[in-house]
Amino acid sequence: MHPGINGKKFPNKPALIMNGSGKVVTHGELNDLSNQGAQLFRSLGLVPGDSIAIMLENHFLFFPIIFAAWRSGLRYTAISWRLQPDEVEYIVRDCEAKVFITSKFLEETALNLDSSLKDVHKFMLDGSTDNYLSYEESIASQPE
């Protein structure tokens, strides 16, 4: 179901509850986060049919990111965080990703990929590092 529907009907009800941390994302927050992500993807020049790649551990922003891709008409490829950098690079290239999103938890792998993904927009959750912009800061500047 489109996040905007439940975001309006049940803005304060939980949409996601993370098992390990207990982090709760409401339907309203899911709608806002996915809309901001979609706005970010559009601002980068992505158009329907383009692709993004996501490599995350069990992270609460995974679903807002895939809903953002869905809202934008983008394809998304989820990549196991247990793969080696050369395997991740192959998948990112093979799916023709224009955006690669990972997290600070996976910084070592991300830095090993940096030079091979020069033509890909790179974002990091929970922080930033060389050539990886903070995803949270990037969506914060986008309209809800």
Mark where each language-model region is.
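Flexible acidic/glycine-rich loop/turn elements at helix↔coil and beta-strand↔loop transitions
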Residues: N6-N12
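Conserved AMP-binding/adenylate-forming core of the ANL superfamily
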Residues: N12-H59, F63, F67, Q84-E89, ...
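Short acidic/polar active-site loop segments enriched in Thr and Asp
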Residues: V47, K98, V120
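Short hydrophobic alpha-helices that are characteristic scaffold elements of the AMP-binding
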Residues: I66-S72, D94
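Short beta->alpha connector loops at strand-helix junctions that form conserved
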Residues: I79-S80, S103, D126
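Conserved ATP-dependent adenylate/AMP-binding module captured primarily in the ANL superfamily
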Residues: L83-N112, E136-Q142
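ANL superfamily adenylate-forming
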Residues: E108-E144
